[in-house]
C-alpha cells in the first residue's frame, strides 16, 4: 500500500512539472502596460469629454438632460445665455469619483456635446482632483461627429438668417392657409 501511494505521489508531481514546463514556452498574454498600449474595443466607454462644433463653438446648450439621465448624479451644470440667444453652460462639472461610465449621458445629449472616449488613464492621488470642470472636459475638436452642428440642424434662428435658411430646414409653412 505504501509503495502504491509513493508511486501515485511521484506521478502527480511529474504531471505538475510537465504542465509548468509546457506553459513556460508558450507566448505571453501579459503586457508591459506603460510601454505597450492596451487594446480597447471601439465602443469602449472611458473618459468623458465635451466637444465643439465645426465652427469652434462649444456644442453644449445646457439642456440638463445629461445630468437628469445620470444614475449616480455626478454631473452638474448651470445654464447661461449669450447675447445672440444661444445657451451655454456657465459651469459644467463631472465628479469622476462617482461616475460609473454607463454612457447614459452620451445617449441623452441631443447635441452630441458629451462623448465617451476610449481613454481610461484617469488615476489621481487625491479625490478632489477627480472633479473635472468645463475647462478640463472641453476638447478642441468635434469628436465622433465631425460635421454635426446642432444650431444648423435644429432649425433655430441664426443671427442674420431668417427661419428656413439653415442647411436641413424646410421653409416655414403658412398655417393660416391650411384652415378651412
UniProtKB/Swiss-Prot annotation:
Tagged with keyword Cytoplasm: no
Disulfide pairings: none
Binding site for [4Fe-4S] cluster 1: 60, 63, 66, 109
Purpose of the protein: NDH-1 shuttles electrons from NADH, via FMN and iron-sulfur (Fe-S) centers, to quinones in the respiratory chain. The immediate electron acceptor for the enzyme in this species is believed to be ubiquinone. Couples the redox reaction to proton translocation (for every two electrons transferred, four hydrogen ions are translocated across the cytoplasmic membrane), and thus conserves the redox energy in a proton gradient.
Record's subunit section: NDH-1 is composed of 14 different subunits. Subunits NuoA, H, J, K, L, M, N constitute the membrane sector of the complex.
Family: Belongs to the complex I 23 kDa subunit family.
Protein name: NADH-quinone oxidoreductase subunit I
Source organism of the structure: Aeromonas salmonicida (strain A449)
Gene: nuoI
Amino acid at each position: 500500500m505504501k509503495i502504491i501511494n509513493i508511486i501515485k505521489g511521484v506521478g502527480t508531481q511529474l504531471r505538475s512539472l510537465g504542465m509548468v514546463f509546457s506553459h513556460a514556452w508558450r507566448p505571453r498574454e501579459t503586457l508591459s502596460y506603460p510601454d505597450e498600449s492596451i487594446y480597447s474595443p471601439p465602443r469602449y466607454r472611458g473618459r468623458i469629454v465635451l466637444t465643439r462644433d465645426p465652427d469652434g463653438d462649444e456644442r453644449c446648450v445646457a439642456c440638463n438632460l445629461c445630468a437628469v439621465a445620470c444614475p449616480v448624479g455626478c454631473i452638474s451644470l448651470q445654464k447661461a445665455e449669450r447675447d445672440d440667444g444661444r445657451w451655454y453652460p456657465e459651469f459644467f462639472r463631472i465628479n469622476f469619483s462617482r461616475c460609473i461610465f454607463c454612457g447614459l449621458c452620451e445617449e441623452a445629449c441631443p447635441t452630441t456635446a458629451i462623448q465617451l472616449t476610449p481613454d481610461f488613464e484617469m488615476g489621481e492621488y487625491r479625490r478632489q482632483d477627480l472633479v473635472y470642470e468645463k475647462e478640463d472636459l472641453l476638447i478642441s475638436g468635434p469628436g465622433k461627429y465631425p460635421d454635426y452642428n446642432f444650431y444648423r440642424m435644429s432649425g433655430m434662428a441664426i443671427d442674420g438668417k431668417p427661419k428656413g435658411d439653415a442647411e436641413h430646414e424646410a421653409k416655414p409653412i403658412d398655417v393660416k392657409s391650411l384652415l378651412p
